[in-house]
Amino acid sequence: MSYTVVALGGNALLRGGEGSIQDQRDTIEQTVPHFVDLYERGHELVFTHGNGPQVGQLLLQNEEAESAAEKPLDVLGAESQAQIGYLLQQQLREELGETPATVITQTIVDEDDPAFDDPTKRIGPFYDEDEASEKDFPVKEGTDGDGNVGYRRVVPSPKPVDIVEAEHIKTLVETGKPVISSGGGGVPVVEDGDSLTGVAAVIDKDRAAQSLATDIGADEFLVLTDVDAVYRNFGTEDEEELSELTTEEAADMLAAGEFGEGSMAPKVEACIEFVESGGDRAIITKPETATEALDGAAGTTVVPADE
C-alpha cells in the first residue's frame, strides 16, 4: 500500500472561461482521468487543491449581496472546500468507480507568525483607486491579467503548523477510499486554549499539502502544476529540464533565486520539506504526465541529499 498526496494546481480545476460551475466541471472532467492508472496500481490517493478563484467569487458575492450578512474569510474558505470537493467527488466516483470523501480541513497557524504583521497575499476582485480608499481592509496595488492597474485586498499568509483533521484523513485513506482535503491550504485557525478560532488569512496550498503528507506518513508527494517539470533558467534560451534534484541541490537553487517566488518556489520548498521530513520522494509535473512521472519518465523528482 502506497500513500500518495496529490496537490492539484489551479489549472487542474479551472482553465479560462468565466469561472462558472460548468467551467469548473469541464476542467475537472479533463483532469481526473489522469489519476485512474495511479489508483488501479494501488496508490491510496489524497487530493489537495487550491481555491483562489472560488474564494474570489465568494468575496465578490459578499460585497454585492447588500441585504445579506457578510461572511468572514475563514467561513468562505470552508465553503469553497465543500464546493470544490463536491465537484471532485462526482468526477472521481465516475472515473474510479469508488466513492471518495471530502474533509473540511482546518490548519493551525501560529498567531505570532510574522506574516500577520505584513499581509501580502492578494485575494478577491480588483478595485479602482476610489473604491479601494473606501475599504476597511488593507489593499495593495497590482495588475490584472490584462495588465490593467488596480487594487486588491491583501491578507496574511502564515506557515502551517499542524493539520487538525490529519488523523481522520489517514483513517479514511486506510480504508482504500480516495480523500479530498486541505482545500486552499485549509481554513487557518489559531489555538485558543482548547478551542480553535478562524482567522482572516490564506495558507500556501503547497506548504499545507506537504504538512498533511508528512502528518499522515505519505510515501509520495505529487505536486501538479501547469508545466511538465522544474527547469533551470526557465523561460530563457538556456533553460534546462531537471529530471532529478537532491534536496541539497534544490535548496541551493532556491537560495540563488532560480524559482519564481509566487509560483515554483513554494512548490520546491514544499518538496524539500516533505523529503527531509521522511518522505520517499516528491515530484513536480503536470496532470497529464502524473503516471509517467511516478515511473521516472517525466517531471522532476526530489530525493534525499544522500542518494
From Swiss-Prot:
This is Carbamate kinase. Carbamate kinase involved in the arginine deiminase pathway of fermentative arginine utilization. Gene3D superfamilies: Acetylglutamate kinase-like (3.40.1160.10). SUPFAM superfamilies: Carbamate kinase-like (SSF53633). GO terms for biological process: arginine deiminase pathway. It is found in: Cytoplasm. Belongs to the carbamate kinase family. It is an enzyme of class 2 (transferase). It catalyses: hydrogencarbonate + NH4(+) + ATP = carbamoyl phosphate + ADP + H2O + H(+). GO terms for molecular function: ATP binding; carbamate kinase activity. PANTHER family: CARBAMATE KINASE, CARBAMATE KINASE-RELATED. Its EC number is 2.7.2.2. Induction: 20-fold induction in fermentatively grown cells. Keywords: Arginine metabolism, ATP-binding, Cytoplasm, Kinase, Nucleotide-binding, Plasmid, Transferase. The keyword Zinc-finger does not apply. Pathway: Metabolic intermediate metabolism; carbamoyl phosphate degradation; CO(2) and NH(3) from carbamoyl phosphate: step 1/1. It comes from Halobacterium salinarum (strain ATCC 700922 / JCM 11081 / NRC-1) (Halobacterium halobium). It comes from the Archaea. GO terms for cellular component: cytosol. The keyword Kinase applies. InterPro entries: AceGlu_kinase-like_sf (IPR036393), Asp/Glu/Uridylate_kinase (IPR001048), Carb_kinase (IPR003964).
